[in-house]
Amino acid sequence: MRRGNSGARGNRGGSRGKPGQNEHIPNFIKNKPWYLAEESEVSASTSAINSNSTISGTGTGTGTELEEKDYLSHHRLKKSSVPDSGTAEIDDAFTYVRPSGRNRKKKDSYDLDLDAPVRRRDEKVIESNYDAKRDRWYGYTPDIKEIERNHKGPDTSHREMDEVQIQEMERLGLKPEDVGFDATQPLSGPKEKYNPVRLREDKAAYLQDMSSEEMLYDPKSRIYKSKEEGTIDPKSKMFHRHLTGDALQVGVINERVRQEAVRSGIKDFEVNKEKLNHVFAANPTKYELMMRTEPERKQETSVEQDAAPKRRKFDKNSFKESSSSSNPGSSTMKDLYDKYM
C-alpha cells in the first residue's frame, strides 16, 4: 500500500488538488503562467462568461466552476481575430505569426546590412584545384603553398646562373654539366637557367637483380654484393669490399709505420691478417646466425656417428665360409642352414 501525502500531485480527494482535474498533469501546466494577462483583464473575461451563463439559464458560476470547465485555457490555441492572417493567439498573451508560402520573403544575393555579395561555390574552381576540394570554402590555402612561397627565393637562386658565375665558368673553362646544371634547356633572358636532371640509366641498386634467384643486394648494410665491389669470405660468409681511393693510401701508411716501429725495437706492433679480415656484426641477422651454427652442427653429428658402435651386416657366403672353416667335418650345421635359410 502506497503511503504519503494524499493531497500532493493534484489528487482529487486532497487539499492541494482541484476536483475534476487529472492528477498526472504537472503543476507548471495547472498553475497560471507568468506571461498571461493582468488580473483586471481576467476579471473582465470572467464577468463576460458569467453574463453568458446567466442568459443561457445556468446562473452565475463561481471561479471553481470556471476552472472545472476549462482549467487549461491558458495553453489553448485560439484563432486570430484577423482573418487569413496565418496567426495563432495563445490566450492573448503573445502572438506567433507564421507567414504562408506566398508571403515568405526570398533571400537576396546581397546582404542588406553589409551590402556585400554572398560567397557561393564555384564549381570550375573546385574541379580545377585539388586543394579547394579539401575545404567547403573554396578560399582555402594549404600550408604547402606558404612554404613554397617562402622558400622560392633560395630554390630559384640555386638553379639560376648570374653573370658572375658565367664569367667564372668561362675563365675556368668549365661547362654547365660539370657544375651540375643541364645544358639542354634553352636559354631565356639575360640569365641562364638550368634544371638538374637525373639520368634514366641511374637506377637503384636493389632493382638490378629483381629477376634473379640469388639476391645480391643486402638491405641490412645497403651494399650490392657484386664481384667488382668485393668478395665473400668463405669462412665468415661476410662480404668484404675492395680497398679503393684513400683506403689504399691508408694501408700503405700503416705498413710504413709498422716497419719503423719494428726497426725502433717495438715488438708489440704485430699484425694478424685473420683479425683484419674479421667483420664485427653489431646486430647479426638470422641468416648469419644460421650460417655460423651450421658447421658446428655438422661436426657434432660426425662425432656422434664415429662414437656409435658399427653393426655388421649378415652375409650368407661369409657365414658358410666361417662355419666350414671352424668345423669342416660337421654336416649338421650345413643342413640346418640350408633348411632354414
Swiss-Prot record:
Ranges of biased composition (kind: Basic and acidic residues): 292-301
The keyword Membrane belongs to this UniProt entry's keyword annotation: no
Superkingdom as given in the UniProt entry: Eukaryota
Biased amino acid composition, Low complexity: 42-57, 320-331
Locations listed in the record: Nucleus
GO biological process: mRNA splicing, via spliceosome
A cellular-component GO term for this protein: spliceosomal complex
Signal peptide positions (record): none
Keyword terms: mRNA processing, mRNA splicing, Nucleus, Spliceosome
Region Disordered: start-end pairs: 1-90, 172-196, 292-341
GO MF: pre-mRNA 3'-splice site binding
One Pfam family cited in the UniProt record for this chain: Slu7
Function as written in the Swiss-Prot or TrEMBL entry: Involved in pre-mRNA splicing.
Membership in a protein family: Belongs to the SLU7 family.
Subunit structure: Associated with the spliceosome.
Name this protein carries in UniProt: Pre-mRNA-splicing factor SLU7
Organism: Kluyveromyces lactis (strain ATCC 8585 / CBS 2359 / DSM 70799 / NBRC 1267 / NRRL Y-1140 / WM37)
